[in-house]
Amino acid sequence: MNRAIVAIACLVFLIALPAHAAPSQREQQLFDLVNHEREKAGLNKLEWNDHLAEAALAHSKLLAENRDLSHQFSGEPILQERVGATKLRFNSVAENVAESPDVVTAHTALMKSPGHRANILHQDYNAIGISIVERDHTLFITQDFAHTLASYTEKQFRESVIANFNQARRARKMSPVDVISDPHLRKAACSQDMHTNKMIQNMPGVSGLLVFSLSEPGALPDDMRKYTSDKTLQRMNIGVCLQTGGVTGFSKFWVVAAFYRSAEYNQ
């Protein structure tokens, strides 16, 4: 009895080709198998992502061309750069590659390998792109996983941070605070000169100043959450600046938040 030989490899990072077409029948089959495993494990299903599929296609072509498994061939960018080049915003990414005679055999082998299984069942990932390229009756498979981020403008992100802050105050039976607008705070956020003592000197009436970075507006840092229970807090100002990750795709927003207590605020 002949046994199919399957080669697999995986890669994880916590950090211009034509657009990929709709998934082929084989790619759809593997996509469905992945989501079936996640559903059995009580996890969210992954969404198909054309950006990830585009990156996966480029790599599967190299797998087939070289008749070998690797996460980076000579002259090829690393995984996060390949995915970042598609303009996808994300904060974690991983990859499985496999060589197999058919989809089911490949999927079975991936699920038996701890590293590959961990990628397939990673609870933080929300998207996947798959590419399968056939050469000489062998399938060369790339699965690219990611936790993708919403595409906020700076204005949208700032408004969401403010809304989440005031929502947290309401949950503590506190009144929402007024928000003033000072373009200097955005400039400070974009400057990457994060010396808070220096900034406070140029902002009369400020009783507290925080500088931090976020990928999602709902993930307020603990130091900012402390102000949600401050009874004396009257106003605040927030400056937001998007710092793109360049080719790596790991984009984030820098935030400068100034707080004014009622007795100290000067109009």
Question: Positions of the model-derived regions?
Answer:
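Positively charged n-region of N-terminal signal peptides that target proteins for export
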Residues: 1-4
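Bacterial N-terminal signal peptides
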Residues: 7-16
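Functional surface patches built around histidine and acidic residues
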Residues: 20-267
